[in-house]
Amino acid sequence: MPKNPSQYILALDLGTTGNRAILFNHQGEIAGQSYQELTQYYPHPGWLEHDAIEIWQDTCNIIKKVLKTTNIDITAIAAIGLTVQRETCLLWDKTTGKPLHNAIVWQDRRTSSLCHQLKTEGKSVEITQKTGLIIDPYFSATKLTWLLEWVKANNPSVALKNVLAGTIDAWILWNLTGGQVHATDHSNASRTMLMNLDTRSWDRDLMDLFGIPERIMPEIRPSLSYFGETDPQLFGAKIPITAIFGDQQAALFAHGCNRPGLLKCTYGTGSFLIIQAGTQVMRSHHQLLSTVAWSTENSAYYALEGAIFTSGAAIQWLRDGLKIINNAAETETLSRQVTDTKGVYFVPALSGLGAPHWDMNARGAFFGITGGVGREHLVRAVLEAIAYQVKEVVDAINLESTLKVAALKVDGGASQNDFLMQFQADALGVPIERPLILDATAQGAAFGAGLTVGFWDDYDSLIASRIIDKIFEPGEDREQVQANFIPWQRAVERAKNWVH
């Protein structure tokens, strides 16, 4: 019998393109869910913002909606687990509860010049040594610098003593607790470029370097711990919040990657590969990131990560930008209509290139277009590029580690695409394992929250109960797929350093 009499765990998965609430029962099954798409704001080329008020209002709405549609009372929820898009950050006024500017999203490149300046000043080695990260606009530090300077210039009446800073988890936690708790967890803090990976605390030297007062930053706590409880005025009850993860780390937790060498890839807006590295920080020699996987009151687990900025975002661009598809599912049908791309290669550098290149001046491109190329060839080239980017990172991981990648666990929206998953298996030459529940980020947050309050007793048995939907084995096209990787790499080299 479970120790906790409540019947459900509520997972909040606050992502880049939308926000989701999912209820999990004692069997680890989804009992209900609700979703709200999130507005994207592009004020200038290369800039991307979210309205933090919209994220908070959506969070309240999706919680109320999932409870209403399932006819479940709030008191039946044992705990809340929160997982969020990482690096996206904001400043807000604690006296008004209002953001001082839109949140700056992880894909935003507005701080490229500041990052370039830091590199020319020789700060790369120090920052990587302290944080495990590579100087890039992707991370929160330069975004917070920009926001503080913007507030000083445009809203000088705001007193710094009233300003709070944080990633999306800190903002939502602060609101859920009625402004009582200003905290984050180690997995999110490790993505700011401000947390020392060895001490797992804010690094004073880096705070000074980026001009960020430590007092405005949230307290860092273990991922699996008691963060506070919901303000009863919000939903009618006090519900404990007992796990916070960055979205990719939550997926790693859901896949049961709790031993060194276990690897997962989430195909979302970007693709994110994380390999569990154990309880010691593992330093990369191949442009991968060292990061916190998750932490408990007693220990911390680390990981190596390859962050790819554009995967699902490229499919969204085909739909909304080029308007050559009506929906994401169409990409599979179109790709199967042709046997190859007719020599077309796509470089998905719509927000620069992440791992293993880290080139903020790269730009997206199609190469090899001739008169006989149709939209199906372009669409197939985009899917192939998503898989080839993952291969680049897996190759880097294999160079890095004594633990060679023997299989890849996958999740996220694009992992529903059977063509892409088979192509991925052929490109890597290893099996691809797709679970029945693809919402691994929400599942990981739920597992963490439930284990913390004793809703579930044992992590291993929880993982063992997960159902595998399909395993994609490398097929007869494997040799051709791997041969085409070489000209694709040539295309990538041509797209790099495009903007001078």
Swiss-Prot record:
Q: Which residues bind ADP?
A: T16, R20, T269, G312, G413, N417
Q: Which InterPro entries match?
A: ATPase_NBD, Carb_kinase_FGGY, Carb_kinase_FGGY_CS, FGGY_C, FGGY_N, Glycerol_kin
UniProt binding sites for sn-glycerol 3-phosphate: T16, R86, E87, Y138, D247
Under the heading Pfam families, the entry gives: FGGY_C, FGGY_N
Which residues bind ATP per the record? Answer: T16, T17, T269, G312, Q316, G413
The family note in this entry says:
Belongs to the FGGY kinase family.
Function (record text): Key enzyme in the regulation of glycerol uptake and metabolism. Catalyzes the phosphorylation of glycerol to yield sn-glycerol 3-phosphate.
Q: Which Gene3D superfamilies match?
A: 3.30.420.40
Pathway per its UniProt entry is: Polyol metabolism; glycerol degradation via glycerol kinase pathway; sn-glycerol 3-phosphate from glycerol: step 1/1
A GO cellular component annotated for this chain's UniProt record is: cytosol
Q: How is its activity regulated?
A: Inhibited by fructose 1,6-bisphosphate (FBP).
- EC primary class: transferase
- This protein's species is Rippkaea orientalis (strain PCC 8801 / RF-1)
Q: Which PROSITE patterns match?
A: FGGY_KINASES_2
Which residues does the annotation say bind glycerol? Answer: R86, E87, Y138, D247, Q248
Entry superkingdom: Bacteria
Q: What is this protein called?
A: Glycerol kinase
Stored HAMAP family: Glycerol_kin
Q: Per its UniProt record, what PANTHER family does this chain match?
A: GLYCEROL KINASE (PTHR10196:SF69), SUGAR KINASE (PTHR10196)
Q: What is its EC number?
A: 2.7.1.30
Keyword entries, A-Z: ATP-binding, Glycerol metabolism, Kinase, Nucleotide-binding, Transferase
Q: A Gene Ontology MF term for this entry?
A: ATP binding
State the Gene Ontology BP annotations.
glycerol catabolic process; glycerol metabolic process; glycerol-3-phosphate metabolic process
Q: Which reaction does it catalyse?
A: glycerol + ATP = sn-glycerol 3-phosphate + ADP + H(+)
